[in-house]
Amino acid sequence: AKAGRDRNMRNSSRRAVTGFSLFAQWLQCIVGCENKSKSGEHPMTRITFRALTTVATCLVFSAAAAQDIRHQLAADVSAGRIESDIRTLVGFGTRHTLSETESDSRGIGAARRWIADEFRRISADCGGCLEVLTISDTVTGRRIPEPTEVVSVVAIQRGTLDPERMVMMSGDIDSRVSDALNGTSDSPGANDNASGMAGAIEAARVLSQHEFPGTIVYAGLSGEEQGLYGGRIVAEHAKRAGWRIKAVLNNDMIGNITGINGVTDNTTARVFSEGTRYVETEEEARTRRFSGGEVDSPSRNLARYVDRMADEFIPNLDVMMIYRLDRFGRGGHHRPFNEAGIPGVRIMETNEHYHRQHQDLRVEDGIEYGDVIEGVNFDYARKLTALNVVSLAGMAMAPPFPANVEIEGAVRPSTTLRWTVPEGRAADNLAGYRVYWRLTTEPQWTWSRDVGLVDSFTLENIVIDNYLFGVASVSKDGVASPVVFPGPTGSFGD
């Protein structure tokens, strides 16, 4: 309840700041009209025109916000369908990477074929809008002693304006018990990670009923429990194929609300993100040391974006941004994408229950162990899936993310930002840009200013030393991209 109140207070504060900002712009417009223009026009002409223009702009964006499709998209996510998919995945007995692949009813082979078929059924419902493919490689490793084919299932919903720009939601197909090499025992993996996989399938159902300027990818990744193999294989394939993946939302355990700590909470979620890019070069690190950006990698600003989507579109859900790649000493399938230079975050429940993770099914000292269906809260899984849906939709609806963002302002009273304005069909929905800034100790972007369709802007009397800065692109419908921090430190790529 406290988290919900805090979130509501934050939202109210943001609305108040936005309203004050709009009023300030209107007032500034009037004050600026006190002097007669060089052309000799009467000051009242300028007052009326500018005031009406500002008010009209405000009304347009207010109307766009009120009609934002993301509210309906969040409502369209079904807890019942997610439950059905989780039960189907659990019904395969085990989905261990080393399990049966020939059976139609048991093992990871049956599970991944069912997932591919489900994506095809979804595609049939949207007139063939999904390209369904498998991406695989044969691997060996500490937890894969014999050469084994690791197969991931991917569905691609192509964008209408900028099909090469992609955002991805992923879940994991595989499961495990106590022994990481046990590929035969029952391993239901209801929460870890049938919940995330079911979320990705449900996101495809909801979003495939609409068209977006950018491309959305839905992925079922294998081999996670054996060493994050599926993510690495898909990331390598993406780089070879020239996929321009701007963001990966990795969902790993999104259905548990009662933790090992005794806390039951269905109002919060965690988002993990790297603070600096794994692929940062020594030269880039030296530059960052003197210019800042230790908490402004593209992945971290992706986390901020997800946090903002929760505040705006998901009732009674507050995102806890964790300034860490993943849980302490642990890993998830966003990591291999980060290691390939692709921004990505992990979205998951706030309170984990370790009796329900990587455990043989048993009762010991009166304690029930095992990742069974009874440990999943389907409405909570629906809520986190809806968070993914609105985040994917927002990024796919936004214009191309700002590229080549640069900043200057050392020993000056003002700060100037520059970026490249794209051309061609991909930029058809680009309305302009929004400049953001915040105190260096603030976790979320605090102030912003819409600056129009320009390739640079100077914030007068905002000293570069005291703040951090970024730029977002804004569509003609008022939908903004994630904020891009200047330089290689914050770049989402070309």
Functional labels for PLM-detected ranges:
Residues 221-335, 340, 344:
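Metal-dependent peptidase/peptidase-like ectodomains
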Residues 73, 81-158:
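A non-catalytic alpha/beta surface segment that caps or lines the substrate-entry region
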